[in-house]
Amino acid sequence: FVTQDVIIKRKDWLSNLLQPIIDNECDASYSRQISNNNTIEKYIRESNYPNISSIVSKADINALGLKAFFFSDASSAIKREVFVKLNGYDGKKFPTNEDMYIAYKLIINGYRIKYCADSEVIHSHKFTFKQQYKRYYDTGRFFKQNKFLNNYKVNKAGSNLAKYVLKRAWQEKNWSVIVNFLPNMIARYVGMKMGKKF
């Protein structure tokens, strides 16, 4: 799976994405995403897509909580036989987060997902506050439609991410990010809350 807004960063992007599946290290894989803009998204990408690869399985759910189902189909691969066996997306239509839905099915059914840090793509957005609100409104709708995901803890993922973003923005003297951080987070929070009430 590759979305239309992804830019390939490395020539070995595809081979590095597929080889772990071919070698039976995992059953699904996804690429490292790098933002080429200087917004909050840049630091969120750094946190969510580090430079070290990792594999997640059912055994990691207790430690990771909801983050065990983190997966991005912006640049990803799934074994065909596994995708067919699991009936893919079950014919459902999602407002967003369809990648989390399939990741949940993979992990719960005993399959492994690998994050491939050496498969790099550029994937960037510059959302206005209104667009950010809409994005998280749709995310809230997704969680309302798939309430079983609310059984998994978020742990400290949100607060850790906020600390990371502010720390990195301060290090780089990125004042625009620091000034816009609070309204950006409010747009996300309110959007999510309203979406869950949809």
Predicted regions and their residues:
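Short beta-strand-to-loop acidic/aromatic patch adjacent to the donor-nucleotide binding site
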Residues: 1-7
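Short, hinge-like loop/turn segments at secondary-structure boundaries
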Residues: 44-49, 131-134
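A short, conserved alpha-helix in the catalytic core of glycosyltransferases
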Residues: 76-78, 82-87, 93-119
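Active-site donor/metal-binding and catalytic loop motifs
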Residues: 109-133, 139-146
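Nucleotide-sugar donor-binding loop of glycosyltransferases
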Residues: 3, 32, 117
